């Protein structure tokens, strides 16, 4: 963008516009319309500059005074400060810049702000904040960042106690870093340096296109030439925001510049040499840094590393030439022999080579097949421990009585579900299993062997598998062993079956409903605990129970004298021992 001429200052144009009675924005609108109508070509060519001027003009307040200043970006990303009147359309006019100060005022202003930011401990927070805002309004360039070293001063404010100052400093730092990265990645052609002849020829071929294709010379896109200047521009641009040591930065710059510069048209050997050189210098630096020596001891290793670096580069550059010479010497006699042979012998030679390659391929396939088809070692089968047959078993005999049915007054029932014939003949004694539970709930039979470890957790697991069925039981509340030889108490929360909901009016219907429920639950129990020996009634009990036994159970109905509210939802199991 062209800079404003000193002869045509803002004061002159203010007086010119104030002489008219029209609004300044109306003048702008009509001026654009007249220019587009009367000078269409010139207007089209200058439309980009007009749009750029609209977005590049920024007004900022001067530090230490209430004077407003206009910042206009120039062609070379320079910053121009022009005085602006602070009183609106009819206010006082600002001070115009002089002809000699116009080019250097931006650098001087940045240097002045840098001095303020460097003395951050002595300055007030308001002054620091205004200085950062002034820097934000300026359009910085890489040259200004390099000359003024403003990045160091702003970097020191990234961890300021004030949130506004630290946030603004981080924002400025990120923008400048992005600007420097963009400048680093820009090709030499875009940065203003001379390109290679190949790139010039390509640009001449593609000059009719809007955007010519990039040249094929990849050295133009290498960021090494700009890397040396970048380290000088922003020394403090590290990831943690800490300033780097001057000695380390200089040493790293020297190593980067020596390794980064390479002439155009270099071969692969130079690339390998540069890579090895970088690796060697990094290892040497890692070995040298932890050691603490005197000044003379430090200078001598630097000279030695320089000499060793040069020797390595020259040796690596000589290696490819020696290898190529050896290949040429070996290839020379073979080519002479091939030239001396006739076409038939050449054909035989090629055929022999082809067969050898086929044989090598087949051998490789066989080796791979042999490796894959190795014999798998036999795995030892894990033998399951055989359980000894227990000499004594404990069988559970069970009874239950019903609690009061909701909405009805039904008598308490005592049903003997065991076969009366077997109970009197095969067992010396049997005790009751009393379950205080509504009649429309399911019950369960548990068979416990003496060989098993009878504890609370084992019984709890067995009960939880059998009792937590759909439409029967929600969950077991607790399991406790009162006496391992006599009683087992299981407390659980029961769940009503919807299909038995308030349809029982007589004791006969109640007994039938209970019989169906028992049949369903006993079938599940028999699958979970199958009988081990059919001579024992522990397993035959499931098979003998059928609807015909309901008549026998109905004959044994009696009225329970105890109240049902004494043990709500509680199971009391008694068992006896019988010889196997």
From Swiss-Prot:
Q: What is this protein called?
A: Probable mediator of RNA polymerase II transcription subunit 26a
Question: What does the subunit comment say?
Answer: Component of the Mediator complex.
What are the TM regions of this chain, as residue ranges? Answer: none
Listed GO cellular component terms?
nucleus
What are the top taxonomic ranks of the organism? Eukaryota, Viridiplantae, Streptophyta, Embryophyta, Tracheophyta
Q: Into which family does the record put it?
A: Belongs to the Mediator complex subunit 26 family.
Q: Which superkingdom?
A: Eukaryota
What are the coiled-coil residue ranges? 347-368
* Alphabetized SUPFAM superfamilies for the sequence: Conserved domain common to transcription factors TFIIS, elongin A, CRSP70
Source species: Arabidopsis thaliana (Mouse-ear cress)
Biased composition range(s): Basic and acidic residues: 244-255, 280-290, 299-309
MF-aspect GO terms = translation elongation factor activity
**Pfam families to which the protein is assigned, alphabetical:** Med26
- Note down the stretches annotated as region Disordered: 244-337
TFIIS N-terminal domain span: 108-183
| Keywords in alphabetical order | Coiled coil, Elongation factor, Nucleus, Protein biosynthesis, Transcription, Transcription regulation
What subcellular locations does the record give?
A: Nucleus
Stated role: Component of the Mediator complex, a coactivator involved in the regulated transcription of nearly all RNA polymerase II-dependent genes. Mediator functions as a bridge to convey information from gene-specific regulatory proteins to the basal RNA polymerase II transcription machinery. The Mediator complex, having a compact conformation in its free form, is recruited to promoters by direct interactions with regulatory proteins and serves for the assembly of a functional preinitiation complex with RNA polymerase II and the general transcription factors.
Name the gene behind this protein.
MED26A
């Amino acid at each position: 963008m062209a800079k404003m001429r000193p002869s045509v200052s803002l004061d002159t144009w203010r007086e010119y516009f104030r002489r008219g009675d029209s609004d300044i924005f109306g003048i702008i609108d009509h001026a654009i319309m007249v220019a587009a109508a009367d000078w269409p070509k010139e207007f089209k060519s200058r439309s980009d500059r007009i749009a750029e001027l609209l977005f590049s003009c920024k007004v900022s307040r001067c530090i230490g005074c209430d004077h407003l200043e206009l910042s206009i970006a120039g062609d070379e990303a320079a910053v121009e400060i022009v005085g602006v009147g602070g009183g609106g359309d009819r206010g006082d006019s600002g001070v115009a810049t002089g002809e000699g100060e116009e080019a250097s005022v931006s650098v001087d202003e940045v240097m002045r702000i840098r001095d303020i930011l460097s003395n951050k401990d002595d300055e007030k927070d308001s002054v620091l904040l205004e200085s950062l805002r002034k820097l934000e309004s300026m359009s910085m360039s890489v040259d200004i960042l390099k000359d003024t070293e403003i990045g160091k001063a702003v970097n020191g404010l990234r961890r300021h106690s004030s949130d506004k100052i630290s946030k603004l400093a981080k924002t400025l730092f990120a923008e400048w870093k992005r600007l420097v990265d963009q400048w680093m990645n820009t090709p030499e052609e875009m940065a203003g340096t001379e390109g290679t002849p190949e790139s010039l020829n390509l640009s001449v071929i593609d000059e009719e296109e809007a955007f010519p294709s990039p040249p094929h010379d990849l050295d133009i896109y290498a960021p090494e030439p700009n890397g040396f200047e970048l380290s000088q521009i922003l020394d403090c641009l590290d990831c943690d925001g800490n300033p780097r040591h001057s000695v380390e930065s200089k040493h790293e710059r020297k190593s980067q510049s020596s390794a980064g510069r390479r002439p155009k048209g270099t071969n692969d050997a130079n690339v390998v040499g540069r890579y090895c050189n970088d690796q060697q210098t990094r290892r040497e630096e890692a070995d040298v840094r932890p050691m603490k020596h005197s000044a003379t001891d430090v200078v001598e290793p630097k000279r030695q590393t320089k000499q060793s670096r040069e020797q390595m580069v020259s040796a690596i550059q000589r290696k490819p030439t020696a290898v190529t010479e050896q290949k040429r010497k070996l290839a020379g006699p073979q080519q002479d022999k091939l030239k001396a042979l006739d076409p038939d012998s050449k054909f035989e030679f090629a055929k022999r080579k082809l067969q050898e390659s086929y044989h090598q391929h087949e051998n490789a396939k066989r080796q791979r097949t042999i490796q894959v088809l190795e014999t798998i070692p036999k795995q030892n089968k894990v033998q399951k421990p055989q359980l000894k047959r227990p000499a004594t078993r404990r069988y559970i005999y069970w009874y239950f009585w019903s609690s009061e049915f909701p909405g009805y007054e039904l008598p308490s029932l005592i049903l003997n579900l065991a076969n009366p014939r077997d109970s009197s003949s095969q067992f010396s004694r049997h005790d009751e299993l009393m379950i205080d539970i509504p009649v429309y709930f399911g019950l369960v039979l548990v068979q416990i062997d003496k060989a098993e470890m009878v504890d609370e957790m084992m019984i709890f697991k067995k009960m939880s598998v059998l009792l937590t069925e759909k439409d029967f039981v929600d969950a077991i509340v607790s399991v406790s062993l009162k006496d391992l030889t006599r009683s087992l108490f299981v407390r659980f929360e029961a769940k009503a079956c919807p299909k038995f909901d308030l349809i029982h009016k007589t004791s006969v219907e109640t007994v039938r409903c209970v019989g169906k429920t028992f049949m369903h639950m006993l079938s599940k129990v028999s699958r979970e605990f199958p009988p081990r020996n059919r001579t024992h009634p522990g397993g035959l009990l499931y098979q003998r129970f059928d609807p015909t036994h309901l008549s026998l159970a109905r004959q044994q109905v009696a009225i329970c004298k105890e109240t049902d509210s004494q043990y709500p939802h509680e199971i009391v199991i008694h068992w006896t021992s019988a010889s196997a």
